[in-house]
Swiss-Prot record:
InterPro entries: Aminoacid_DH-like_N_sf (IPR046346), Malic_enzyme_CS (IPR015884), Malic_N_dom (IPR012301), Malic_N_dom_sf (IPR037062), Malic_NAD-bd (IPR012302), Malic_OxRdtase (IPR001891), Malolactic_enz (IPR048182), NAD(P)-bd_dom_sf (IPR036291). Mn(2+) binds at residues 234-235, 258. Its cofactor is Mn(2+); NAD(+). One of its GO terms (cellular component) is cytosol. Homodimer. Substrate binds at residues 163, 448. Keywords: Lyase, Manganese, Metal-binding, NAD. One of its GO terms (biological process) is malate metabolic process. This is Malolactic enzyme.
Length: 540
């Protein structure tokens, strides 16, 4: 490999940290300033530049320049400032870069761009993108349901890139072993189709047999090329997400973050709340506000946990209610998704069914103790709704977890104030600490970043053949043991600043459960050791 190729390869490049011996051996003499820096000095210099950027969007652009030139330095810096950088590198700032991707495009970032019109190119595309790297983890999106901002076509590749950044920063998954993938199946966003600078296919989305055939071919090819692959589905539309997951979850090690990941972290937050009150999950009434992939997935996860705690499936479903655009879901509605149908009620059981299009009326009628918002409908959790929740139970669980910030159902501060500090709160974006009547309430972030990195690390370390419900349950339980139930105002989820420790605990729980179920192919029998041995550190 030639000198300039090394300097242009982000997996190999050290920049000014190449030693004199390395510069001599690699033909780099005279191509770098004479001073040899440590990674600490490089990070100090880079962070100083970062602080000069006036907006989060410009800060993200700067950090992506580092990412594109030196992965090790990028992750060293990210680990050092993980709480500060997370909302810049990922949600919410990434939404702005996705919306402007075609106009800001500079570097493909070793992503694989799959074109639904050319299935014959899948093999070549994946091999070209991977090069000589052994890929263990793929995050793939078709970008139909990005981060509450909708359909962004090829531009959604940034969500795959961003997700993998969190995998590495939080759990130490080797960045050379990951591959971001986007399936360009078209887009229904008119502004993209009419933009001559849009870099994706200028066609409306393709659905049905052609779409599923392409996905099948992608999965088969990826599994063939990368035999130890863990496949993560991200931000697929509600019409396809559950179908795809159900097609593959009993065949390969795979995971859908929107359907499963959010459910795990919300369940962990519920466990954290119930640890404080001493109540049982099977005594709760759950209201899902927003019946898309995330909302239905969370409800499904909590339902599965109720069943594991002793209820029959039918008994457990009686504890659940779901509201979507048409109001409370009834089984006579024609447009229910497969994921929504189990939660739909019989209209005849509710004499005021016609009034069940309003959240407040539903809360007063079905008397939930848990309210989770995934609607992206800002302001939906009004003061009256919060007060009605408090009338149902002494300490309600209220999680407005829609993101980005402008899509939240309410703010944590409003929930604390309107509930007089009684409600347990977690939000989908960082909310910090809220002082109310002398108590500092630390607001947990129901951020999937607490769960999916560790889950992935556990899957890779154990070389698990499948991701089972039991392994997912183990991940959720591992979260709940990390909060302090005796501290007033304590968060119901561990703060993101501890995500590295959280990820190790989640990984160990998942790997050990896989081992118990006889699903591991790793030669290592000590799963805690397997997890620690696999963890990658950003060092030269």
């Amino acid at each position: 490999m030639r000198a300039h190729e090394i300097l242009n390869n982000p997996f190999l490049n050290k920049g000014t940290a190449f030693t004199m011996k390395e510069r001599q051996e690699l033909g780099l003499i005279g191509l770098l300033p004479p001073t040899v820096q440590t990674i600490e000095e490089q990070a100090e210099q880079t962070y100083e530049q970062y602080l000069t950027k006036p907006s989060d969007l410009e800060k993200r652009h700067f950090l992506m320049e580092i990412f594109n030139t030196n992965r090790t330095l990028f992750y060293y810096l990210f680990n050092k400032h993980i709480v500060e950088f997370n909302p810049v590198v990922y949600d919410p700032t990434i939404a702005d870069t996705i919306e402007n991707y075609s106009h800001l495009f500079v570097d493909p970032q070793y992503a694989a761009y799959l074109d639904i019109n050319h299935p014959e190119n899948i093999t070549e595309t994946l091999k070209n993108a991977a090069g000589d790297r052994e890929i263990r983890l793929i995050v793939v999106t078709d970008a139909e349901g990005i981060l509450g901002i909708g359909d962004w076509g090829t531009q959604g590749v940034d969500i795959s890139v961003g997700k993998l950044m969190i995998y590495t920063a939080a759990a130490g998954i080797d960045p050379a072993s990951v591959l971001p993938v986007v399936i360009d199946a078209g887009t229904n966003r008119k502004e993209l189709l009419e933009d001559h600078l849009y870099l994706g296919n200028h066609q409306e989305r393709i659905y049905g047999d052609q779409y599923y055939s392409f996905v099948d071919q992608f999965v088969e090819t990826a599994e063939s090329i990368f035999p130890k692959l863990y496949l993560h589905w991200e931000d697929f539309g509600r019409s396809n997400a559950a179908t795809i997951l159900n097609n593959y979850k009993t065949k390969i090690p795979t995971f859908n973050d929107d359907i499963q990941g959010t459910g795990i972290v919300v369940l962990g937050g519920i466990f954290g709340s119930l640890d404080i009150t001493g109540e049982k999950l099977t005594d709760q009434v759950y209201l899902c506000y927003g019946g898309g992939s995330a909302g239905a997935g969370i409800a499904g996860r909590v339902h599965a946990e109720m069943v594991s705690e002793g209820l029959s499936e039918e008994e457990a479903y009686k504890h659940f209610f779901m509201i979507d655009q048409q109001g409370l879901l009834f089984d006579d509605m024609e447009d229910l998704t497969p994921a929504q149908k189990p939660f739909a009620k019989k209209r005849a059981d509710y004499k005021d069914a016609g009034d069940m299009t309003d959240l407040l009326n539903v809360v007063k009628t079905v008397k939930p103790t848990i309210l989770v918002g995934t609607s992206t409908n800002p302001g939906a959790f009004t003061k009256e709704v919060v007060e009605a929740m408090c009338a149902n139970t002494e300490r309600p669980v209220i999680f407005p977890i829609s993101n980005p910030t402008k899509k939240m159902e309410t703010t944590a501060e409003q929930v604390i104030e309107w509930s007089d500090g009684k409600a347990f709160v977690a939000t989908g974006v960082p909310s910090g600490t809220i002082s109310y009547k002398g108590v500092d309430y630390q607001i947990g972030q129901a951020n999937n970043s607490l769960i999916y990195p560790g889950l992935g690390l556990g899957m890779l370390a154990s070389e698990a053949k499948l991701l089972t419900d039991e392994m997912i349950g183990a991940a959720a339980h591992s979260l709940s043991g990390l909060v302090d139930p005796g501290k007033p105002g304590a968060p119901v989820l561990p703060p993101f600043e501890f995500v590295a420790d959280v990820s190790i605990k989640v990984a160990e729980a998942v790997a050990k459960k896989a081992q118990e179920q006889g699903l591991t192919e790793s030669k290592e029998t000590d799963m805690a050791k397997a997890v620690r041995d696999l963890k990658w550190y950003p060092e030269y």
